[in-house]
Amino acid sequence: MDYYRKYAAVILVTLSVFLHILHSFPDGEFTMQDCPECKPRENKFFSKPGAPIYQCMGCCFSRAYPTPVRSKKTMLVQKNVTSESTCCVAKSLTRVMVMGSVRVENHTECHCSTCYYHKF
């Protein structure tokens, strides 16, 4: 019986150490690894050999926080949570024609800025 208690104690200690290490990382440390930084990446659909087309792709930040009481009083429809986010957008671009008559923006530089067009 003492034999099994020792194994149970070792398992519990190992589990608690693992959970301590897991909770010591800042929030989002593991999820950010899947999300690349905001920069121009080649658009395979519009690119041709020798004439690549680049589009801004990547992640920026978003956050939500409680709406301040002073701000709530000015809202027509009061909301308890306020959110803000930035999107990966082109800082500079050139317009080019592809496939004969399709006008496409070739992004040359990207940055995180206000989101104007939200993707669903």
Swiss-Prot record:
<feature type="disulfide bond">
    <location>
        <begin position="35"/>
        <end position="59"/>
    </location>
</feature>
<dbReference type="Pfam" id="PF00236">
    <property type="entry name" value="Hormone_6"/>
</dbReference>
<feature type="disulfide bond">
    <location>
        <begin position="38"/>
        <end position="88"/>
    </location>
</feature>
<comment type="function">
    <text>Shared alpha chain of the active heterodimeric glycoprotein hormones thyrotropin/thyroid stimulating hormone/TSH, lutropin/luteinizing hormone/LH, follitropin/follicle stimulating hormone/FSH and choriogonadotropin/CG. These hormones bind specific receptors on target cells that in turn activate downstream signaling pathways.</text>
</comment>
<keyword id="KW-0732">Signal</keyword>
<feature type="glycosylation site" description="N-linked (GlcNAc...) asparagine">
    <location>
        <position position="106"/>
    </location>
</feature>
<dbReference type="GO" id="GO:0007186">
    <property type="term" value="P:G protein-coupled receptor signaling pathway"/>
</dbReference>
<dbReference type="GO" id="GO:0006590">
    <property type="term" value="P:thyroid hormone generation"/>
</dbReference>
<keyword id="KW-1015">Disulfide bond</keyword>
<protein>
    <recommendedName>
        <fullName>Glycoprotein hormones alpha chain</fullName>
    </recommendedName>
</protein>
<dbReference type="InterPro" id="IPR029034">
    <property type="entry name" value="Cystine-knot_cytokine"/>
</dbReference>
<dbReference type="GO" id="GO:0005615">
    <property type="term" value="C:extracellular space"/>
</dbReference>
<comment type="similarity">
    <text>Belongs to the glycoprotein hormones subunit alpha family.</text>
</comment>
<feature type="disulfide bond">
    <location>
        <begin position="56"/>
        <end position="110"/>
    </location>
</feature>
<keyword id="KW-0372">Hormone</keyword>
<feature type="disulfide bond">
    <location>
        <begin position="60"/>
        <end position="112"/>
    </location>
</feature>
<keyword id="KW-0325">Glycoprotein</keyword>
<keyword id="KW-0964">Secreted</keyword>
<feature type="glycosylation site" description="N-linked (GlcNAc...) asparagine">
    <location>
        <position position="80"/>
    </location>
</feature>
<feature type="signal peptide">
    <location>
        <begin position="1"/>
        <end position="24"/>
    </location>
</feature>
<dbReference type="InterPro" id="IPR000476">
    <property type="entry name" value="Glyco_hormone"/>
</dbReference>
<dbReference type="GO" id="GO:0016914">
    <property type="term" value="C:follicle-stimulating hormone complex"/>
</dbReference>
<dbReference type="GO" id="GO:0016913">
    <property type="term" value="F:follicle-stimulating hormone activity"/>
</dbReference>
<feature type="disulfide bond">
    <location>
        <begin position="87"/>
        <end position="115"/>
    </location>
</feature>
<comment type="subunit">
    <text>Heterodimer. The active hormones thyrotropin, lutropin, follitropin and choriogonadotropin are heterodimers composed of CGA, a common alpha chain described here and a unique beta chain which confers their biological specificity to the hormones: TSHB for thyrotropin, LHB for lutropin, FSHB for follitropin and choriogonadotropin subunit beta/CGB for choriogonadotropin.</text>
</comment>
<dbReference type="GO" id="GO:0010893">
    <property type="term" value="P:positive regulation of steroid biosynthetic process"/>
</dbReference>
<dbReference type="GO" id="GO:0010469">
    <property type="term" value="P:regulation of signaling receptor activity"/>
</dbReference>
